[in-house]
């Protein structure tokens, strides 16, 4: 018996083989229509971010380090907005699964109103305390880097209301099953960001440009264009289930729906903010290791995010698929589909990471020609590939759990793993033992490992479906009266 025959017999004996036709239907009819546009959207966002980094990197290493430090704080705020966006996505998907369009519209409208007002308040506070924030984040970075980081932060906080509108509006459209419109809007937004930022930084024709200031200003302008596009799409009813007129934003709020969104969004936002705050703290560890290490760490995260794109798209798709299935009471289907998405992500991402790791130096050369920075990037990308098999259990599974409105478990696990592993292990290995940026990243991988074990256990035990008991017959809930 040759090897191929033996492998064929092993495959034929698995449960997957007997259900391969249903998995094929699931992949092409459920996963692909959702995940591919989300993947393309995320790819466009990240690629435009890479190009933005290129634009800034030509201004020098200090400029790139300044943007990296300011963006490490901006990520905390964007993570909070994305968490509320997730709550909106789940409520919209669940409501439309029950064919309750009115509730989906009200959830979208009220999320947009609340988060826009909150973003204005947040931007005002951060603008006022910007210098103290940068001093805290930048640690022992040079005075020049801190000054550039403060300039970039003060410009980008002006875009927070627009970012909130774009994120929440896009999330609502995805929850309604329309992933193409967010792709077009966010893709166009990022292309505009490159064009506008390029002109503002380096000038056009005889105009010399604004230099470093143009980077933050270009991002802010493009975000407001994206916010206007989202509001216009919702106003004209491009997706009939989410037609929201401009005057409806001034109607009274319905707090029962707000609390439903926040019931998912607040635990998810606490998780995201604590996670990104912990990540920010680890960036502070790196900030004292020199400009080359700061830049190399920033570039390595950018490349790793590109490698993880398919997994991020599958995670977003799993939230929508789970919410839809549970909205119509298909509990077993929700469980089967989450397992399928998880294994698809695990195998796919591991293959991508291992195939791209040998080209880490080539990828780094697109960002910089500094040999010290490139050396840091190569080491970190190889480490990322080594630990990639546990990434999907850490990130795709909790995304699916949130579609089942099981957000609190992910919050507590993230708090434990972030502060118990990433921060503590990163500090001990990176600072106390002198391992440098490698020790900080080993703390991150310890965080992944703890998350992977706890989330995988949650999946196999079925406890993430605790709100949907199988033993009891499904009861029809009386829909509350919702006013638009």
Name the predicted role of every residue range.
Residues 64-124, 163-182, 294-360, 391-414:
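Small-residue-rich hydrophobic transmembrane alpha-helices
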Residues 33-52, 155, 222-226, 230, ...:
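Transmembrane helical elements of multi-pass membrane transporters/channels
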Residues 22-54, 58-59, 75-87, 119-123, ...:
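N-terminal transmembrane alpha-helices
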Residues 1-35, 92-159, 207-266, 322-387, ...:
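Short alpha-helical transmembrane segments in multi-pass integral membrane proteins
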Residues 85, 155-174, 182-190, 215-231, ...:
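Short runs within selected transmembrane alpha-helices of multi-pass transporters and secretion channels
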Residues 46-65, 134-143, 199-210, 269, ...:
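Helix-terminus/linker motif at the lipid-water interface of multi-pass membrane proteins
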Residues 61-72, 149, 153, 216, ...:
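Small-residue hotspots at the loop-to-helix junctions and early N-terminal turns
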Residues 38, 42, 53-54, 71, ...:
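Transmembrane alpha-helix boundary and packing residues in multipass membrane permease domains
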């Amino acid at each position: 018996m040759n090897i191929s025959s033996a492998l064929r017999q092993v495959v034929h004996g698995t449960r997957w083989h007997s259900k391969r036709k249903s998995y094929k239907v699931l992949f092409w009819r459920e996963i692909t229509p959702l995940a591919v546009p989300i993947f393309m959207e995320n790819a466009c966002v990240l690629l435009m971010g890479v190009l933005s980094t290129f634009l800034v990197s030509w201004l020098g290493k200090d400029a790139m380090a300044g943007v990296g430090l300011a963006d490490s704080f901006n990520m905390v705020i964007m993570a909070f907005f994305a968490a509320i966006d997730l709550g909106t996505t789940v409520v919209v998907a669940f409501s439309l699964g029950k064919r309750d369009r009115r509730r989906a519209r009200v959830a979208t409208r009220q999320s947009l109103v609340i988060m826009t007002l909150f973003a204005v308040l947040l931007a005002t506070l951060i603008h006022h305390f910007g210098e103290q924030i940068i001093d805290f984040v930048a640690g022992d970075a040079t005075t020049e880097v801190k000054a550039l980081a403060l300039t970039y932060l003060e410009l980008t906080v002006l875009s927070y209301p627009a970012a909130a509108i774009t994120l929440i509006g896009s999330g609502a459209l995805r929850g309604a099953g329309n992933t193409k419109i967010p792709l077009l809007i966010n893709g166009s937004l990022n292309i505009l960001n490159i064009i506008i930022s390029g002109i503002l930084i380096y000038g056009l024709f005889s105009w010399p440009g604004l230099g470093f200031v143009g980077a933050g200003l270009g991002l802010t302008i493009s975000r407001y264009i994206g916010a206007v596009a989202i509001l216009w799409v919702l106003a004209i009813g491009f997706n009939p289930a989410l037609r929201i007129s401009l005057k409806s934003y001034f109607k009274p709020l319905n707090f029962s729906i707000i609390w439903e969104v926040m019931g998912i969004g607040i635990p998810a936002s606490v998780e995201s903010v604590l996670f990104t705050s912990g990540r920010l703290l680890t960036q502070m560890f790196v900030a004292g290791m020199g400009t080359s290490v700061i830049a190399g760490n920033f570039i390595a995260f950018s490349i790793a995010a590109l490698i993880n794109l398919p997994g991020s798209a599958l995670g977003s798709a799993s939230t929508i698929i789970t919410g839809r299935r549970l909205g119509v009471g298909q509990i077993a289907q929700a469980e089967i589909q989450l397992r399928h998405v998880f294994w698809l992500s695990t195998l796919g991402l591991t293959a991508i990471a291992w195939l791209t790791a040998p080209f880490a130096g080539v990828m780094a050369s697109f960002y910089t020609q500094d040999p010290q920075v490139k050396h840091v990037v190569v080491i970190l990308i190889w480490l990322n590939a080594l630990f990639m098999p546990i990434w999907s259990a850490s990130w795709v599974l909790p995304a699916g759990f949130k579609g089942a409105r099981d957000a609190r478990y992910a919050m507590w696990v993230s708090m434990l793993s972030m502060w118990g592993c990433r921060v503590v292990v990163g500090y001990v290995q990176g600072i106390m033992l002198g391992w440098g940026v490698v020790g900080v990243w080993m703390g991150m991988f310890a965080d992944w490992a703890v998350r992977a074990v706890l989330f995988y256990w949650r999946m196999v035990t079925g406890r993430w479906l605790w709100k949907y008991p199988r033993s009891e017959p499904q009861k029809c809930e009386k829909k509350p009266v919702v006013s638009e």
